[in-house]
Amino acid sequence: MPAIGIDLGTTYSCVGVFQYGKVEIIANDQGNRTTPSYVAFTDSERLIGDAAKNQVAMNPKNSVFDAKRLIGRRFDDSKIQEDIKHWPFKVINDNGKPKISVEFKGANKCFSPEEISSMVLTKMKETAEAYLGTTVKDAVITVPAYFNDSQRQATKDAGAIAGINVLRIINEPTAAALAYGLDKNLKGERNVLIFDLGGGTFDVSILTIDEGSLFEVRSTAGDTHLGGEDFDNRLVNHFAEEFKRKYKKDLRSNPRALRRLRTAAERAKRTLSSSTEASLEIDALYEGHDFYSKVSRARFEELCGDLFRNTLEPVEKALKDAKMDKSQIHDIVLVGGSTRIPKVQNLLQNFFGGKTLNLSINPDEAVAYGAAIQAAILSGDKSSEIKDVLLVDVAPLSLGIETAGGVMTKLIERNSRIPCKQSKTFTTYADNQPAVTIQVFEGERALTKDNNVLGTFDLTGVPPAPRGVPKIDVTFDLDANGILNVTAKEQGTGNAKNITIKNDKGRLSQADIDRMLSEAEKYAEEDERHRQRIAARNQLETYLFGVKEAAENGGDRISAADKSSIVERCSEAMKWLDSNTTAEKEEYEYKLKELEQFCSPIMTKMHKGGGDGQQAPNFGQQAGGYKGPTVEEVD
């Protein structure tokens, strides 16, 4: 059973598998090699991927995207508060966690970002299963290198809800470097800078690749909230202001108009990567007003200038952390759809003194490609192409505990190799202190109040002694997924306590995950029932039209009375179909059976009357158990 690699993106996701010595990027049921990270809820069904994105203008409030911008964050996070202004769906505060509120089958439902992401993961898993012809359990899932502990944990939870055994969470730029290193058969030792600008996140990683098989991450930097969508927002605001000037109306209050404008703005942005001007034509955009406009590449670059320039800061930081000079970088590899923007390439190239950028890997697929390689390695694939590959990654943020005065005392420095283990000895702050509170933080600031708290626990049973006497060993153990385990042990008594940082404020409990997993199975069953219903309806329709057409074109092989009774019966059935669009599968099947019982004798008679030895038309499923496909595709 092969293991797969999934690039779970903000706007698009991609899945690959390593087999027969090479990686296959797998196309979905629409033939697309990337799938929109969209989930939509309607009165009758749940849609995921292309089908969800295609109906978004008709159903903006119940079409959910950008779950990756919500995952592992608190509701009051300033980035989320900023995003809420742009999202057509409703985000609510559930005990400090953001939840997405939608209307599904006529009822209000709330989903956590993990559940929405799990639905996208399920879609990617099913895409792989359809291609491989077998069930898939194991996967490597990628996250931005700059994701913190709670965002990584939440992504792992999303995998669990999707019924996936997550072999490892790996960093996107590291996965892209794997793809680059193995695809290019690199010789010698090369310093490679991966510049990964996607739909919602931005990462820079510097790796040393030795002989194309040892991949050592030297440093990583980035912004988990910068990407193509931020450029779209700037364009949308620009056009909305223009509309307001022209028509004295603000379309931003209307989710449908805003969505149509966003789709057109995104298309214009893509056009501007290859042309110097893009035009927008949207009929009846808002209150009957057509909106026709143009935007030049120069104008777009001015609108997003500060965001584009911001991408260079993490590049400088990564170089500094890796203790490297610009001239020491051999290859600059571009990953993520937003690196197609000419201005982004131009700024980066100028930063490196005109050095040619490497555009040789597919920016949309490189991350899934690398994840598929890592999945094969972790599942024990011994193929010659990957048997020597060794990947050494790093921690994106420093980890430490709070000591007297609210000071952040670091145990693991950022860019330390992972997995890693570090210990330090601490003591009590007051005489006869019976317990110590260990507060764990991540971040780079000197005071803990400016960093992100990961968890807290108490070590009790410290024997009474003057301050400074008891010795408490604190050990940080950071695993290969970048997830932290903390142990505190009192030397005198051997008393110990440990926690895996599960960021309880933002994390799902095991019970939550189990509940969501069973709900996910229930939704999958409902989806299957819905598919069967549509199939039964199509079967009935196909039979209806077929019989009606055969009767009408039967000529003298069918009597006028038989013909009119068939046409009448078919018209009745069509009316029934139109007024029973939400009938159950069994009702459609019963109706088909009824119709067959009535029409089959006449059809047989007509066929015999024809006497030309032709085969009777086989509609739907007539007696004799018709084996061919009886279902047509429905959009």
UniProtKB/Swiss-Prot annotation:
GO MF, one term, reads:
ATP binding
Where are the Phosphothreonine residues found in this chain? 127
GO terms in the biological process aspect are: chaperone cofactor-dependent protein refolding; determination of adult lifespan; protein refolding; response to starvation
Name the keywords, alphabetized.
Answer: ATP-binding, Nucleotide-binding, Phosphoprotein, Stress response
**Pfam families, A to Z:** HSP70 (PF00012)
Q: Which family does it belong to?
A: Belongs to the heat shock protein 70 family.
* NCBIfam families in the record: PRK00290.1 (NF001413)
Protein name from the UniProt record: Heat shock protein 68
> Which species expresses this protein natively?
Drosophila melanogaster
